[in-house]
Amino acid sequence: MAASLSRLSAGLAASRPLGLSRSFLLLVLLLLNSGYKGDSTKPACGQPWWPKNLDLSRHWPWEVSLRVGNEHVCGGALIDLKWVVTAAHCIQGTKEYSVILGTSKLKPPNSTRTLLIPVRDIIMHPKYWGRTFIMGDVALLQLYNPVIISKYVQPICLPEPNYSLKVGTKCWVTGWGQVKQRFSANSTLASELQEAEVFIMDNKKCDQIYRKKSHIPRVVPLVLGDMICATNYREDLCSGDSGGPLACEVEGRWILAGVLSWEKACAKVRNPGVYTRITKYSRWIKKQISNGILSVPCTSAWLLLLFWLLQPQMGP
């Protein structure tokens, strides 16, 4: 690095007699800074490629396995080339996380379609209260490298903040947890990605279900406004899928309605899943993504160039 900086410095010094004023070069640099926004091409979201016979094969290209080492800890959903949404309670301490995309297998074989990308940065929502009383249970993961879009890796759409899903809307929940009908205390995670058809439930009814065995006073709601419930009363997914997507098809596009936040007594079929309602956080998510895009690569070379341009003119 020192050698390259020396060469750059020498090159800059040699270029001074060319007559290019510092003011002009500084203006060019500022224009580049204001105009460059990284890769401006955005992949189409929420439009997965599926075979005609969905009974034989269905894949969810935004599905993410969040990992610590080789261990799957939570699910997540790809929403942009370098951004994943998951539940905030999935993040613990200062562990080094990575994500796997492009596969339905918990332990994928070596394949060109499977992506393993380290997590560069984690942004927790400021209203997250913690694992005891969950609120603001959403986190953003910024990846070190952008994903390579294929039919196996595609982002899901973020819903507009004012969009409201009607009670009874059909959605899908996916993850590597066991389905409730096959749940047991000794269950391990499923080797293949599981899916379950669910329906949006009224928050008040959802709150009543969970309140029956709760000692919390009735004046304190368990299911808050930033949560959304879904179930089909027959089959749902169990623990191991926290942070996983609740995906709903709306006008031909799939949107991320929620990420799995919590549920109680997985073996009891009538207990719905409670998800973080993404519409409540769409603006925050978009703001973080826009703030996270560096307008210019902040390298030593750029800093040295800027420093050189701002130096007082030496000589005649």
UniProtKB/Swiss-Prot annotation:
The active site is at H89 (charge relay system), D137 (charge relay system), S242 (charge relay system). GO terms for biological process: proteolysis. Glycans are attached at N110, N162, N186. SUPFAM superfamilies: Trypsin-like serine proteases. It is found in: Secreted. InterPro entries: Peptidase_S1_PA, Peptidase_S1_PA_chymotrypsin, Peptidase_S1A, Ser/Thr_Proteases_Immune/Dev, Trypsin_dom, TRYPSIN_HIS. Residues 49-290 form the Peptidase S1 domain. Its main location: secreted. GO terms for molecular function: serine-type endopeptidase activity. Its EC number is 3.4.21.-. Keywords: Disulfide bond, Glycoprotein, Hydrolase, Protease, Secreted, Serine protease, Signal. One of its GO terms (cellular component) is extracellular space. Disulfide bonds join C74-C90, C171-C248, C206-C229, C238-C266. The keyword Secreted applies. Belongs to the peptidase S1 family. This is Serine protease 45. It comes from Bos taurus.
